[in-house]
């Protein structure tokens, strides 16, 4: 199966290299309302340049701003970025400490622009394990942009798809146990309201950078019918052309949701 996926990815990459899309081209087609991105490759980007891994993470922060601005200009309604997974705590302490400072640096630097651009900041994930300084920066950004009604910039921070599903199942089980919910009333629609993304539509497009072909425990429920675009480009090298390319590939797909 893995070989089949790799062959398919190589075919997609070869085909993609034949076309280049402009912003005007993309605006003529369907724009995904919700785009999710697994921002991968910061460490490898730094290693290729004989730099510490944290240099790659810092460079990747600049790409977050550029991508957010472009997505907003194109009319995307929700941009969800996988910033830190529940498994990332296993990394070296120095790297984790730096990653926990990045949201603070990003928001302190770019929050005025996000407010001006009518972007609303949100977060999904287990906030209880986050350092106080990280949480303060996020809470301020969420509060300062709460009245904005433009694109939602949704950071998945200390997030894990399996944990999210288990938590939702436990909440539903508690309601059944206490008698406030009949088990027969539980369906996909109700289950979705117990997820961290309860108020958001599912992503139509998932992009992963760095050439890896896996979900890494990201939005396992929500991406059931998402279109996937895998690119070999490392996240710090991800530019406007690459984002437009992913959207162009999305617009060439036929989304049938199990039909013909």
UniProtKB/Swiss-Prot annotation:
The keyword rRNA-binding does not apply. InterPro entries: UPP_synth-like (IPR001441), UPP_synth-like_CS (IPR018520), UPP_synth-like_sf (IPR036424). The keyword S-adenosyl-L-methionine does not apply. Mg(2+) binds at residues 40, 227. Its cofactor is Mg(2+). It holds the Pfam family Prenyltransf. Keywords: Magnesium, Metal-binding, Transferase. Binds 2 magnesium ions per subunit. The active site is at 40, 88 (proton acceptor). It comes from the Bacteria. Belongs to the UPP synthase family. Homodimer. Catalyzes the condensation of isopentenyl diphosphate (IPP) with allylic pyrophosphates generating different type of terpenoids. This is Isoprenyl transferase. The lineage of its organism: Bacteria, Bacillati, Bacillota, Bacilli, Bacillales. The gene is uppS.
